[in-house]
Amino acid sequence: MRLSQKWARYVVGLSVISGFGAGQPALGQSPKPSAVYLSRARESYQNVWNRYRVPAYGLFSENYPSNQADSLTYMQGGGVKEKAVSFLWPFSGLFSATNVLLKTPSERKTQLRYLDSLVAGMETYRDTNRSPVGYQAYPVQFEKADRYYDDNGLVGIDYMEAYLNTRNPLYLSRAKTVFAFILSGWDDELGGGVTWLEGHRDQKPACSNGMATLTALKLYQGTKDPYYLQWGQKFYNWMHASLLDSTGVYANDRKATGALNRVFYTYNSGSMLEAAVLLYQFTGDKQYLNQAEQLAKDSFVHFAKRPHPAPMAIQIDLPWFVTVLFRGYDALYRVNGDYQYVARIRKSLDYAWQHSRDQYGLVTHSWMPDPKELAKPKWLLDQACIAELYARLSLLEKERETKR
Protein backbone atom coordinates (compact mmCIF):
# COMPACT_ATOMS: atom_id res chain seq x y z
CA MET A 1 0.00 0.00 0.00
CA ARG A 2 1.48 3.38 -1.08
CA LEU A 3 1.73 5.99 1.68
CA SER A 4 0.23 9.40 0.99
CA GLN A 5 2.79 12.22 0.69
CA LYS A 6 1.47 13.83 3.87
CA TRP A 7 1.77 10.60 5.82
CA ALA A 8 5.20 9.88 4.34
CA ARG A 9 6.46 13.24 5.55
CA TYR A 10 5.01 12.52 8.97
CA VAL A 11 6.92 9.23 9.11
CA VAL A 12 10.12 10.98 8.02
CA GLY A 13 9.54 13.60 10.70
CA LEU A 14 9.22 10.89 13.31
CA SER A 15 12.47 9.32 12.17
CA VAL A 16 14.28 12.66 12.53
CA ILE A 17 12.81 13.33 15.97
CA SER A 18 13.67 9.86 17.17
CA GLY A 19 17.15 10.01 15.64
CA PHE A 20 16.39 6.81 13.70
CA GLY A 21 19.49 5.50 11.98
CA ALA A 22 21.67 8.29 13.27
CA GLY A 23 22.04 7.57 16.96
CA GLN A 24 19.10 7.39 19.38
CA PRO A 25 18.92 10.43 21.69
CA ALA A 26 18.08 9.96 25.33
CA LEU A 27 14.42 10.22 26.26
CA GLY A 28 13.33 13.86 26.28
CA GLN A 29 16.40 15.05 24.36
CA SER A 30 16.27 16.72 20.97
CA PRO A 31 18.30 14.97 18.26
CA LYS A 32 21.71 16.43 17.65
CA PRO A 33 22.12 18.62 14.54
CA SER A 34 24.47 16.07 12.97
CA ALA A 35 21.76 13.42 13.19
CA VAL A 36 19.08 15.72 11.78
CA TYR A 37 21.27 16.75 8.88
CA LEU A 38 22.31 13.19 8.12
CA SER A 39 18.66 12.17 8.05
CA ARG A 40 17.91 14.98 5.60
CA ALA A 41 20.90 14.02 3.45
CA ARG A 42 19.68 10.43 3.31
CA GLU A 43 16.13 11.47 2.50
CA SER A 44 17.23 13.85 -0.27
CA TYR A 45 19.63 11.34 -1.75
CA GLN A 46 17.15 8.47 -1.77
CA ASN A 47 14.45 10.71 -3.17
CA VAL A 48 16.69 11.61 -6.11
CA TRP A 49 17.59 7.99 -6.69
CA ASN A 50 13.98 6.84 -6.59
CA ARG A 51 12.49 9.59 -8.74
CA TYR A 52 15.17 10.42 -11.30
CA ARG A 53 16.62 6.98 -11.97
CA VAL A 54 16.17 5.71 -15.55
CA PRO A 55 16.66 1.95 -15.04
CA ALA A 56 16.83 1.14 -18.75
CA TYR A 57 20.13 3.03 -19.01
CA GLY A 58 21.40 2.98 -15.42
CA LEU A 59 21.39 6.79 -15.54
CA PHE A 60 19.12 9.63 -14.41
CA SER A 61 16.60 12.00 -15.95
CA GLU A 62 17.34 15.70 -16.28
CA ASN A 63 14.14 16.72 -14.46
CA TYR A 64 11.39 15.26 -12.31
CA PRO A 65 8.67 14.93 -13.36
CA SER A 66 10.38 14.33 -16.68
CA ASN A 67 9.43 16.96 -19.24
CA GLN A 68 11.28 16.28 -22.45
CA ALA A 69 9.95 19.46 -24.05
CA ASP A 70 12.05 21.51 -21.64
CA SER A 71 14.82 23.66 -23.11
CA LEU A 72 18.23 23.57 -21.41
CA THR A 73 20.24 26.78 -21.38
CA TYR A 74 23.62 25.71 -20.01
CA MET A 75 25.17 24.33 -23.22
CA GLN A 76 27.18 26.11 -25.92
CA GLY A 77 24.61 27.92 -28.08
CA GLY A 78 21.77 27.27 -25.60
CA GLY A 79 18.32 25.96 -26.50
CA VAL A 80 19.20 22.25 -26.20
CA LYS A 81 16.15 20.08 -25.56
CA GLU A 82 15.85 17.71 -22.62
CA LYS A 83 16.63 14.14 -23.68
CA ALA A 84 16.19 10.56 -22.49
CA VAL A 85 18.78 10.94 -19.71
CA SER A 86 20.63 13.83 -18.10
CA PHE A 87 23.71 15.59 -19.34
CA LEU A 88 27.01 15.00 -17.54
CA TRP A 89 26.95 18.09 -15.31
CA PRO A 90 23.82 17.18 -13.29
CA PHE A 91 24.88 13.52 -13.21
CA SER A 92 28.15 14.60 -11.62
CA GLY A 93 26.20 16.33 -8.86
CA LEU A 94 24.90 13.00 -7.59
CA PHE A 95 28.39 11.47 -7.78
CA SER A 96 29.66 14.35 -5.62
CA ALA A 97 26.92 13.80 -3.03
CA THR A 98 27.84 10.11 -2.88
CA ASN A 99 31.47 10.96 -2.19
CA VAL A 100 30.50 13.10 0.80
CA LEU A 101 28.10 10.51 2.22
CA LEU A 102 30.88 7.92 1.94
CA LYS A 103 32.78 9.84 4.63
CA THR A 104 30.09 9.00 7.21
CA PRO A 105 30.85 5.54 8.70
CA SER A 106 27.19 4.53 9.03
CA GLU A 107 26.61 5.23 5.32
CA ARG A 108 29.73 3.67 3.87
CA LYS A 109 28.46 0.17 3.07
CA THR A 110 25.34 1.46 1.33
CA GLN A 111 27.13 4.26 -0.50
CA LEU A 112 29.83 1.95 -1.87
CA ARG A 113 27.09 0.14 -3.79
CA TYR A 114 25.75 3.43 -5.11
CA LEU A 115 29.30 4.45 -6.03
CA ASP A 116 29.73 1.32 -8.15
CA SER A 117 26.58 2.16 -10.07
CA LEU A 118 27.58 5.80 -10.54
CA VAL A 119 31.04 4.87 -11.78
CA ALA A 120 29.43 2.66 -14.42
CA GLY A 121 27.15 5.55 -15.30
CA MET A 122 30.01 8.04 -15.52
CA GLU A 123 31.79 5.83 -18.02
CA THR A 124 28.86 6.06 -20.45
CA TYR A 125 29.98 9.67 -21.05
CA ARG A 126 33.59 8.64 -21.79
CA ASP A 127 34.58 9.29 -25.39
CA THR A 128 37.47 7.20 -26.70
CA ASN A 129 36.89 7.99 -30.38
CA ARG A 130 38.63 11.36 -30.16
CA SER A 131 42.14 11.96 -28.91
CA PRO A 132 42.93 12.55 -26.13
CA VAL A 133 40.29 10.54 -24.30
CA GLY A 134 37.81 12.72 -22.43
CA TYR A 135 34.22 12.87 -21.22
CA GLN A 136 31.55 14.35 -23.45
CA ALA A 137 28.42 16.18 -22.36
CA TYR A 138 26.00 13.35 -23.21
CA PRO A 139 26.39 9.54 -23.17
CA VAL A 140 28.24 8.25 -26.23
CA GLN A 141 25.65 5.51 -26.87
CA PHE A 142 23.18 8.19 -27.92
CA GLU A 143 25.23 10.71 -29.89
CA LYS A 144 28.51 12.54 -30.38
CA ALA A 145 28.56 15.60 -28.12
CA ASP A 146 30.85 18.48 -27.18
CA ARG A 147 33.55 17.92 -24.59
CA TYR A 148 33.65 20.69 -22.00
CA TYR A 149 36.77 21.31 -19.95
CA ASP A 150 34.70 22.28 -16.91
CA ASP A 151 32.70 19.03 -17.14
CA ASN A 152 35.95 17.09 -17.29
CA GLY A 153 37.21 18.97 -14.26
CA LEU A 154 34.12 17.80 -12.39
CA VAL A 155 34.81 14.21 -13.48
CA GLY A 156 38.40 14.54 -12.28
CA ILE A 157 37.32 15.89 -8.90
CA ASP A 158 34.67 13.18 -8.50
CA TYR A 159 37.12 10.41 -9.33
CA MET A 160 39.78 11.81 -7.01
CA GLU A 161 37.30 12.11 -4.14
CA ALA A 162 36.25 8.52 -4.84
CA TYR A 163 39.91 7.49 -4.82
CA LEU A 164 40.59 9.28 -1.54
CA ASN A 165 37.55 7.51 -0.07
CA THR A 166 38.38 4.01 -1.34
CA ARG A 167 42.01 3.95 -2.58
CA ASN A 168 40.77 2.12 -5.68
CA PRO A 169 43.60 2.69 -8.21
CA LEU A 170 41.14 2.63 -11.11
CA TYR A 171 39.67 5.93 -9.96
CA LEU A 172 43.11 7.52 -9.73
CA SER A 173 43.94 6.33 -13.24
CA ARG A 174 40.76 7.86 -14.62
CA ALA A 175 41.40 11.17 -12.87
CA LYS A 176 44.86 11.28 -14.45
CA THR A 177 43.33 10.61 -17.88
CA VAL A 178 40.87 13.45 -17.36
CA PHE A 179 43.60 15.85 -16.33
CA ALA A 180 45.61 14.99 -19.44
CA PHE A 181 42.54 15.90 -21.51
CA ILE A 182 42.20 19.23 -19.69
CA LEU A 183 45.87 20.04 -20.28
CA SER A 184 45.38 19.46 -24.00
CA GLY A 185 43.31 22.65 -23.91
CA TRP A 186 45.98 24.82 -22.26
CA ASP A 187 47.69 27.45 -24.41
CA ASP A 188 49.56 30.70 -23.88
CA GLU A 189 46.88 33.02 -25.25
CA LEU A 190 45.89 35.50 -22.53
CA GLY A 191 48.83 34.22 -20.51
CA GLY A 192 47.55 30.65 -20.12
CA GLY A 193 44.42 28.82 -19.05
CA VAL A 194 41.92 26.66 -20.93
CA THR A 195 38.75 27.53 -22.81
CA TRP A 196 35.22 26.41 -21.97
CA LEU A 197 35.04 23.54 -24.44
CA GLU A 198 37.12 21.79 -27.03
CA GLY A 199 37.34 23.60 -30.37
CA HIS A 200 35.87 26.92 -29.18
CA ARG A 201 38.36 29.64 -28.41
CA ASP A 202 36.09 32.60 -27.66
CA GLN A 203 36.68 32.73 -23.88
CA LYS A 204 38.70 31.38 -20.97
CA PRO A 205 36.26 30.95 -18.09
CA ALA A 206 36.57 30.60 -14.35
CA CYS A 207 34.51 27.41 -14.39
CA SER A 208 36.97 25.41 -16.53
CA ASN A 209 40.12 26.77 -14.93
CA GLY A 210 38.82 26.64 -11.36
CA MET A 211 37.81 23.00 -11.68
CA ALA A 212 41.13 22.23 -13.40
CA THR A 213 42.92 23.80 -10.42
CA LEU A 214 41.04 21.56 -8.01
CA THR A 215 41.56 18.44 -10.15
CA ALA A 216 45.31 19.06 -10.12
CA LEU A 217 45.42 19.73 -6.38
CA LYS A 218 43.36 16.66 -5.52
CA LEU A 219 45.64 14.59 -7.75
CA TYR A 220 48.55 15.94 -5.73
CA GLN A 221 46.70 15.12 -2.52
CA GLY A 222 46.33 11.52 -3.66
CA THR A 223 49.76 11.00 -5.23
CA LYS A 224 52.18 13.57 -3.70
CA ASP A 225 53.57 13.92 -7.22
CA PRO A 226 54.93 17.50 -7.48
CA TYR A 227 53.88 17.59 -11.14
CA TYR A 228 50.26 18.02 -10.06
CA LEU A 229 51.07 20.59 -7.38
CA GLN A 230 52.95 22.64 -9.96
CA TRP A 231 50.01 22.51 -12.35
CA GLY A 232 47.61 23.36 -9.55
CA GLN A 233 49.68 26.44 -8.74
CA LYS A 234 49.92 27.34 -12.43
CA PHE A 235 46.13 27.24 -12.90
CA TYR A 236 45.60 29.04 -9.59
CA ASN A 237 48.06 31.79 -10.48
CA TRP A 238 46.44 32.30 -13.89
CA MET A 239 43.00 32.58 -12.30
CA HIS A 240 44.26 34.95 -9.61
CA ALA A 241 46.00 37.20 -12.13
CA SER A 242 43.39 37.08 -14.89
CA LEU A 243 39.94 36.75 -13.34
CA LEU A 244 40.04 38.19 -9.80
CA ASP A 245 37.94 41.35 -9.98
CA SER A 246 38.34 44.60 -8.07
CA THR A 247 35.25 43.59 -6.06
CA GLY A 248 37.31 40.76 -4.56
CA VAL A 249 35.39 37.97 -6.31
CA TYR A 250 36.10 36.05 -9.50
CA ALA A 251 34.64 37.18 -12.82
CA ASN A 252 33.03 34.66 -15.16
CA ASP A 253 35.60 34.72 -17.97
CA ARG A 254 38.06 36.65 -20.06
CA LYS A 255 37.16 36.96 -23.72
CA ALA A 256 39.60 36.16 -26.53
CA THR A 257 39.94 39.94 -26.99
CA GLY A 258 41.25 40.19 -23.44
CA ALA A 259 38.10 41.88 -22.13
CA LEU A 260 37.00 40.77 -18.65
CA ASN A 261 33.40 39.58 -18.49
CA ARG A 262 32.36 41.06 -15.15
CA VAL A 263 29.54 38.62 -14.46
CA PHE A 264 29.83 36.98 -11.05
CA TYR A 265 28.64 33.56 -9.90
CA THR A 266 29.14 32.09 -6.45
CA TYR A 267 30.85 28.91 -7.62
CA ASN A 268 33.70 30.64 -9.42
CA SER A 269 34.83 32.13 -6.11
CA GLY A 270 34.01 28.88 -4.30
CA SER A 271 36.37 26.75 -6.37
CA MET A 272 39.21 29.21 -5.84
CA LEU A 273 38.50 29.47 -2.12
CA GLU A 274 38.82 25.70 -1.74
CA ALA A 275 41.94 25.75 -3.93
CA ALA A 276 43.57 28.44 -1.77
CA VAL A 277 42.93 26.38 1.36
CA LEU A 278 44.41 23.26 -0.26
CA LEU A 279 47.49 25.19 -1.39
CA TYR A 280 47.96 26.47 2.15
CA GLN A 281 47.66 22.94 3.53
CA PHE A 282 50.10 21.52 0.96
CA THR A 283 52.73 24.26 1.06
CA GLY A 284 52.35 25.95 4.45
CA ASP A 285 52.59 29.29 2.63
CA LYS A 286 50.43 31.74 4.56
CA GLN A 287 49.76 33.89 1.49
CA TYR A 288 47.25 31.24 0.43
CA LEU A 289 45.50 31.30 3.81
CA ASN A 290 45.37 35.09 3.66
CA GLN A 291 43.92 34.94 0.15
CA ALA A 292 41.37 32.33 1.25
CA GLU A 293 40.22 34.39 4.22
CA GLN A 294 39.94 37.53 2.10
CA LEU A 295 38.01 35.71 -0.62
CA ALA A 296 35.63 34.19 1.94
CA LYS A 297 34.87 37.64 3.31
CA ASP A 298 34.61 39.36 -0.08
CA SER A 299 32.45 36.64 -1.63
CA PHE A 300 29.99 36.68 1.23
CA VAL A 301 29.77 40.47 1.25
CA HIS A 302 29.36 40.61 -2.53
CA PHE A 303 26.60 38.01 -2.81
CA ALA A 304 24.84 39.24 0.34
CA LYS A 305 24.53 42.63 -1.37
CA ARG A 306 22.97 41.15 -4.50
CA PRO A 307 19.12 41.18 -4.57
CA HIS A 308 17.74 38.22 -2.64
CA PRO A 309 14.70 37.36 -0.48
CA ALA A 310 14.97 38.14 3.24
CA PRO A 311 15.12 34.46 4.39
CA MET A 312 18.26 33.90 2.27
CA ALA A 313 21.67 35.00 3.56
CA ILE A 314 22.97 35.58 0.02
CA GLN A 315 21.70 35.48 -3.52
CA ILE A 316 21.00 31.85 -4.50
CA ASP A 317 22.16 32.22 -8.10
CA LEU A 318 22.05 28.44 -8.55
CA PRO A 319 21.84 25.92 -5.69
CA TRP A 320 24.80 23.93 -6.99
CA PHE A 321 26.83 27.13 -7.42
CA VAL A 322 26.17 27.93 -3.76
CA THR A 323 27.18 24.36 -2.90
CA VAL A 324 30.59 24.91 -4.51
CA LEU A 325 30.96 28.13 -2.51
CA PHE A 326 29.97 26.18 0.60
CA ARG A 327 32.75 23.67 -0.14
CA GLY A 328 35.18 26.56 0.12
CA TYR A 329 33.69 27.80 3.39
CA ASP A 330 33.77 24.23 4.71
CA ALA A 331 37.45 23.85 3.79
CA LEU A 332 38.35 27.19 5.37
CA TYR A 333 36.52 26.38 8.61
CA ARG A 334 38.66 23.26 8.98
CA VAL A 335 41.87 25.31 9.02
CA ASN A 336 40.86 28.51 10.84
CA GLY A 337 37.71 27.54 12.80
CA ASP A 338 35.63 30.41 11.36
CA TYR A 339 32.10 29.02 11.20
CA GLN A 340 30.20 32.21 10.35
CA TYR A 341 29.90 31.61 6.60
CA VAL A 342 28.90 27.98 7.02
CA ALA A 343 26.27 29.00 9.57
CA ARG A 344 24.68 31.54 7.25
CA ILE A 345 24.36 29.15 4.32
CA ARG A 346 23.06 26.50 6.72
CA LYS A 347 20.29 28.84 7.89
CA SER A 348 19.21 29.52 4.30
CA LEU A 349 19.23 25.81 3.48
CA ASP A 350 17.17 24.97 6.56
CA TYR A 351 14.59 27.54 5.49
CA ALA A 352 14.39 25.92 2.06
CA TRP A 353 13.96 22.48 3.61
CA GLN A 354 11.20 23.62 5.94
CA HIS A 355 9.29 25.89 3.55
CA SER A 356 10.19 25.28 -0.09
CA ARG A 357 9.67 21.60 -0.93
CA ASP A 358 7.04 20.46 -3.39
CA GLN A 359 4.60 17.55 -3.22
CA TYR A 360 7.46 15.14 -4.03
CA GLY A 361 9.76 16.51 -1.34
CA LEU A 362 11.95 18.33 -3.90
CA VAL A 363 13.34 21.79 -3.15
CA THR A 364 12.66 24.77 -5.42
CA HIS A 365 15.40 26.34 -7.53
CA SER A 366 15.32 29.62 -5.58
CA TRP A 367 14.96 27.91 -2.16
CA MET A 368 11.80 30.00 -1.73
CA PRO A 369 8.16 28.74 -1.58
CA ASP A 370 7.14 30.39 -4.83
CA PRO A 371 3.90 28.74 -6.08
CA LYS A 372 5.04 28.67 -9.71
CA GLU A 373 8.35 27.08 -8.77
CA LEU A 374 6.68 24.55 -6.52
CA ALA A 375 4.54 23.41 -9.47
CA LYS A 376 7.43 23.14 -11.96
CA PRO A 377 9.56 20.04 -12.65
CA LYS A 378 12.76 20.07 -10.59
CA TRP A 379 16.26 19.81 -12.06
CA LEU A 380 18.45 16.87 -11.02
CA LEU A 381 21.40 19.10 -10.10
CA ASP A 382 19.25 21.31 -7.85
CA GLN A 383 18.30 18.23 -5.82
CA ALA A 384 21.59 16.32 -5.78
CA CYS A 385 23.33 19.30 -4.19
CA ILE A 386 20.81 19.35 -1.32
CA ALA A 387 21.98 15.85 -0.37
CA GLU A 388 25.60 16.98 -0.62
CA LEU A 389 25.04 20.09 1.50
CA TYR A 390 23.28 18.21 4.27
CA ALA A 391 25.91 15.45 4.21
CA ARG A 392 28.62 18.10 4.59
CA LEU A 393 26.72 19.82 7.39
CA SER A 394 26.26 16.51 9.19
CA LEU A 395 30.02 15.88 9.12
CA LEU A 396 30.79 19.42 10.28
CA GLU A 397 28.27 19.31 13.10
CA LYS A 398 29.50 15.89 14.21
CA GLU A 399 33.02 17.29 14.58
CA ARG A 400 31.73 20.32 16.48
CA GLU A 401 29.68 18.10 18.81
CA THR A 402 32.71 15.97 19.69
CA LYS A 403 34.70 19.10 20.59
CA ARG A 404 32.09 20.45 23.01
Model-derived features: positions:
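CBM-like carbohydrate-recognition segments
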Residues: P31-A97, L101-R113, S117-D150, K204, ...
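Extended ligand-binding groove/face enriched in aromatic
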Residues: L112-G222, P226-Q233
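Bacterial Sec-dependent N-terminal signal peptides
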Residues: M1-P31
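Amphipathic alpha-helical segments of tetratricopeptide repeats
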Residues: L183-S184, Q221, H240-A241, Q281, ...
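Active-site cradle of extracellular carbohydrate-active enzymes
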Residues: A206-A212, A216-Y220, Y227-A276
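Short coil/turn linking the two alpha-helices of tandem helical-hairpin repeats
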Residues: L102, S106, Y163-R167, Y220-K224, ...
